[in-house]
């Protein structure tokens, strides 16, 4: 004799409502985007400053020359690096690096050595001299338009106000890394535990 399973006393619309509630109770996927220099990493020992049109700027030629493996490995971590590591280990998160650096294997090795390997690295191409804020907006904007990332909450950490301003229309929350590193605290709503 074949027995039929008992009929559910729950209506289809009620079951659909339960599925909807369960899906909406799931934590929303977050994308944490970190700049590197003066955000997560202190590489100031490699920086040579110069005056250009009355403004103090980074000498990019000297920077490139000083970006040897030996010097990169002398960089140190800033307080925000601890939070980046927590984000990497957390569920429902992607961690991206978006840097104006031209990333070398030594840069990737440095991140790995400190447990800071992100899901994705966006970086400057070798001969690209696009202004940082334009470059970052372009790189991040292309990816956030892809379907898997459209509904994610985005949190961007950078030390330069010009970069934060450029990404205002793309990012849910722009956070000044310099201020966070100075006070050593992350806003409570992004605690990963």
What are these regions (language model features)?
Residues 18, 35-37, 158-159:
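Acidic active-site catalytic centers that drive phospho-/nucleotidyl reactions
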Residues 27-130:
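Alpha-helical substrate-recognition element adjacent to the catalytic core
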Residues 10, 97-100, 157:
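Active-site-adjacent beta-strand anchor residues
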Residues 27, 31, 102-193:
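C-terminal cap/substrate-recognition subdomain and adjoining C-terminal extension
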Residues 4-20:
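Short, small-residue-biased leader/transition segments that mark boundaries at the very start
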């Amino acid at each position: 004799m074949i027995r039929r399973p008992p009929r559910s006393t729950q209506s289809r619309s009620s079951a659909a409502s339960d599925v909807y509630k369960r899906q909406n109770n799931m934590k929303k996927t977050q994308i944490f985007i970190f700049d590197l220099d003066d955000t997560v990493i202190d590489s100031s020992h490699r920086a040579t400053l110069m005056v250009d049109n009355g403004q103090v700027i980074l000498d990019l030629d000297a920077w490139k020359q000083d970006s040897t493996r030996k010097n990169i490995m002398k960089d140190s971590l800033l307080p925000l690096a601890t939070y980046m590591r927590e984000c990497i280990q957390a569920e429902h998160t992607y961690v991206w690096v978006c840097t104006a650096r031209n990333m070398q294997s030594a840069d990737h090795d440095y991140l790995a050595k400190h447990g800071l390997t992100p899901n994705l690295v966006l970086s400057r191409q070798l001969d690209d001299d696009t202004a940082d804020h334009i470059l970052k907006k372009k790189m991040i904007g292309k990816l956030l338009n892809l379907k898997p990332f459209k509904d994610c909450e985005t949190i961007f950490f950078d030390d330069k106000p010009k970069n934060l301003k450029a990404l205002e229309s793309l990012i849910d929350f722009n956070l000044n890394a310099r201020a966070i590193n100075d006070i050593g605290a992350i806003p409570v709503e992004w605690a990963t535990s």
